[in-house]
């Protein structure tokens, strides 16, 4: 019996060893060979199906696209960039990316040609990347098909990412690019479900955070490398997650116009976080959409160019038709044109607590029919033109700027034109401001033929201190000037202002246009040089003023 049990034990051991050997053979047999076709494996259901992902890329940040049923492609909400079964198209800020993720350890060979879909445009830059290593790249300027080289027998591990990237060359117009690669894979079977997320996708950033940090999208402070792509990616991700963008302390480099659309961007403080624009002709931070905010940071141009045509692309900040926007606690240092330009019908905005200096044009300029804007508690020094201005043009503005409040600002200090100016506009309130040391009038209310501006109506100027303005010769502006060379200025009221130390004269009302009702109530005029008042035009109403 004992002998029989011993024999059975040997048999069992033999069977166990055999199973082990069979298992080893089975593992070796699990190696597979499979071809992954970009076009045949294209999915309209889920990212990662058949190992394929559809993304956009800015800098080092990959972001998932969303499937667009109408176009039968994966696309950004704006429509670009996009990736279809057979083609890709980038946009100005993002590359278009088709990505394959290796299911296991093995070797791949990539085949299939790439070509522009149109002879128009300035071309595209196409590349193949293994994780962050570029395997191949080519610039395509015509529709000739090109076959990538050096992409055979490439070793991969489970999770290795192979990215097919289409980047604009200069402009993204006509950048439709035909590219449907095949990947022949030999290796471990791994997972065929393929729904695992792209490990390099910025969606892997900490979603539990209440903010989106630009650092999570590749930005690095205090170096000379361009952070623009990382900022674009962070803003895009923040909008999709409905979170603000946070920019930690340090200096960040921006090579182009940064557009913020419906997102809050906040720094660590206007003396801690700095955004440095390196292109003096395209350095504006543009605010668009609804609820956009910019706060707690400094924006500076590395160099500036001449004001020239005054292009908005050269402003420090441009508000382009935004609604319910805020610009708070921002330090603007240098710009080729305006510091903060609010235009294209922007509405319901607050510009508060900012410091602006050495701008090429106006410090803060409101135009283009913008309305319901409050500008308060700002400091403006050494503006290249007016410190704060409301301007309405007949030729280019659909309506006059209206319902603007300008209060509690401290402005002037060597600014090269007027202090606070209304040159066309209605329902404007100017109150509790300190205005000093400007080349032209401290307060200027006017309609100008030279710029074909609109009429002025219902402007109230109250409780301001206007001190030693109108410095420039031979202009010899008074501290306060109401002027019309065309159109109508009407219903302008000055209440309880202190107007003192005018460089050449105190108050002036004149011009060849129509000036109607101008009222002065309880103002104090302290003046020693030239005429105290020059009322050459209009229906002037005086009530309890001193020094007139």
How should these model regions be labeled?
Residues 108, 212, 245, 252, ...:
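Solenoid scaffold repeats with emphasis on beta-solenoid/beta-helix
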Residues 31-190:
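Gly-Asp-aromatic-enriched flexible segments
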Residues 214-248:
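Acidic Gly/Asp/Thr-rich repetitive segments characteristic of extracellular carbohydrate-active
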Residues 102, 232-237, 252-266, 273-296, ...:
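Extracellular beta-strand-rich solenoid/capping regions of secreted or surface-exposed proteins
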Residues 297, 330, 354, 378, ...:
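Consensus "Asn ladder" position of solenoid repeat domains
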Residues 2-25:
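Sec-dependent N-terminal signal peptides of Gram-positive bacterial secreted proteins and lipoproteins
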Residues 243, 254-258, 270, 274-283, ...:
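Short glycine/acidic-rich loop motifs that flank beta-strands on beta-rich extracellular proteins
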Residues 293-394, 398-401:
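Right-handed parallel beta-helix
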């Amino acid at each position: 019996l004992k002998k029989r049990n011993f024999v059975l034990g040997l048999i069992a051991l033999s069977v166990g060893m055999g199973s082990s050997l069979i298992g080893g053979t089975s593992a070796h047999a699990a190696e597979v060979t499979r071809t992954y076709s970009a076009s045949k494996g294209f999915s309209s259901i889920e990212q990662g199906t058949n190992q394929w992902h559809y993304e956009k890329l800015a800098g080092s940040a990959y972001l998932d696209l969303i499937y667009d049923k109408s176009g039968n492609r994966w696309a950004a909400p704006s429509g670009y960039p996009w990736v279809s079964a057979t083609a890709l198209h980038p946009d100005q800020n993002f590359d278009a990316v088709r990505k394959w993720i290796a299911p296991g350890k093995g070797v791949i060979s990539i085949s299939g040609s790439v070509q522009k879909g149109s002879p128009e445009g300035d071309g595209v830059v196409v590349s193949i990347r293994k994780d962050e290593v570029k395997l191949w790249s080519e610039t395509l300027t015509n529709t000739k098909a090109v076959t990538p080289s050096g992409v055979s027998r490439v070793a991969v591990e489970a999770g290795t990412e192979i990215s097919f990237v289409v980047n604009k060359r200069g402009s993204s117009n006509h950048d439709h690019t035909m590219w449907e690669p095949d990947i022949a894979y030999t290796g471990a079977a791994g997972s065929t479900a393929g729904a695992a997320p792209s490990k390099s996708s910025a969606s892997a950033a900490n979603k539990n955070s209440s903010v989106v940090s630009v650092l999570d999208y590749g930005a690095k402070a205090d170096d000379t490398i361009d952070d623009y792509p990382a900022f674009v990616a962070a803003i895009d991700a923040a909008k999709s997650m409905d979170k603000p963008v946070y920019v930690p302390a340090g200096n960040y480099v921006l090579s182009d116009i940064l557009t913020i659309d419906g997102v809050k961007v906040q720094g660590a403080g206007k003396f801690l976080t700095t955004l440095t624009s390196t292109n003096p002709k395209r350095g504006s931070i543009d605010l668009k959409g609804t609820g956009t905010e910019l706060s707690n940071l400094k924006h500076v141009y590395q160099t500036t160019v001449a004001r020239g045509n005054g292009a908005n692309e050269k402003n420090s900040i441009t508000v382009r038709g935004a609604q319910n926007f805020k610009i708070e606690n921002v330090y603007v240092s240098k710009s080729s044109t305006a510091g903060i330009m609010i235009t294209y019908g922007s509405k319901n905005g607050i510009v508060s607590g900012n410091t602006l200096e050495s701008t090429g044009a106006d410090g803060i300029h409101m135009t283009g029919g913008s309305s319901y804007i409050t500008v308060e508690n700002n400091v403006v020094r050494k503006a290249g033109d007016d410190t704060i201005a409301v301007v309405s043009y007949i030729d280019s503005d659909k309506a006059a700027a209206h319902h603007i409040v300008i209060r509690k600002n401290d402005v002037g200090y060597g600014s090269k034109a007027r202090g606070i100016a209304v040159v066309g506009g209605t329902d404007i309130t100017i109150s509790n401001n300190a205005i000093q040391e400007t080349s032209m009038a401290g307060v200027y209310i006017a309609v100008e033929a030279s710029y074909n501006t609109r009429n002025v109506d219902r402007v109230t100027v109250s409780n301001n201190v206007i001190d030693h303005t109108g410095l420039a010769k031979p202009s010899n502006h008074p501290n306060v000037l109401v002027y019309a060379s065309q159109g109508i200025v009407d219903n302008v009221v000055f209440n309880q202002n202190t107007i003192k130390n005018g460089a050449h004269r105190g108050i002036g009302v004149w011009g060849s246009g129509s000036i109607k009702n101008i009222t002065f109530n309880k103002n104090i005029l302290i003046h020693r040089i030239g005429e105290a008042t020059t009322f050459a035009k209009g229906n002037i109403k005086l009530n309890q003023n001193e020094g007139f």
